């Protein structure tokens, strides 16, 4: 059975707290796992969340500030220690290549796994295209070079049993119609409907910019930083971050179905205020104020 869910490993921003670890998010997408922004302590959080090194197929780092990347050293060494049986691909800003190398080879260990380096440069663009999804990136606005990521499942078609019966199509003929697009004068479009592929977006440290909206547009799930509350918007702009209200307005204007707020400044004690401000900004879809070690299902597909 396919599983599509977000496993939240950490939700703090620059400074971890007693209740919030540095960043870390594993997206389970059917049989594949994509680890985003492994901050300090990610390896232990994986253990607590029931995530194994074998679950990781791809690593995506938005930028090289410590709360988003210090966990790379431990995670990479654990992947090799456990002799993960498949290659792992790492995406990260090309401008931070020297940081990646330092973290990859922070200490001595035996390399047993193929780790493919696929850095992101320029405006971003398509990073990977598989039968299951396309992975894109877009440049964000932060004091150091930062990229967000977007995963898009290909659109497919859903066969409609009533229309198949109406045209007398059954058994092996259904497969032939799906393969060839036409059968006995009946086209695939006549007996099916488009099923839109699911879309997932991951947006960390950034001010509002075109890249934020490009990544968020039409997402079934948007995981987005909301470091500050609205009353501290000036701080957010100065330091290259978003407020809860700004993140929620992006989600509202982009047609996001499920908004996941995370990356909270340690200055705030009550996470419910982030939800209050997000609702006040007009977002009325599913909303999760992330906590460490929770699992958030990707919304089920909906038909047009």
UniProtKB/Swiss-Prot annotation:
Assembly and oligomerization: Homodimer.
SS bond partners: none
Superkingdom of the source species: Bacteria
CC cofactor: Zn(2+)
Binding, Zn(2+) 1: 63, 65, 142, 205
NCBIfam families reported for this sequence: PRK00055.2-3
Species, as recorded: Streptomyces griseus subsp. griseus (strain JCM 4626 / CBS 651.72 / NBRC 13350 / KCC S-0626 / ISP 5235)
Cofactor: binding details: Binds 2 Zn(2+) ions.
EC number: 3.1.26.11
Biological role stated in the UniProt entry: Zinc phosphodiesterase, which displays some tRNA 3'-processing endonuclease activity. Probably involved in tRNA maturation, by removing a 3'-trailer from precursor tRNA.
Cell membrane in keyword set: no
Family: Belongs to the RNase Z family.
GO MF annotation: an example: zinc ion binding
PANTHER family for the chain: ZINC PHOSPHODIESTERASE ELAC PROTEIN 1
Reaction(s) this enzyme catalyzes, per UniProt: Endonucleolytic cleavage of RNA, removing extra 3' nucleotides from tRNA precursor, generating 3' termini of tRNAs. A 3'-hydroxy group is left at the tRNA terminus and a 5'-phosphoryl group is left at the trailer molecule
List of residues binding Zn(2+) 2: 67-68, 205, 263
Protein name as catalogued: Ribonuclease Z
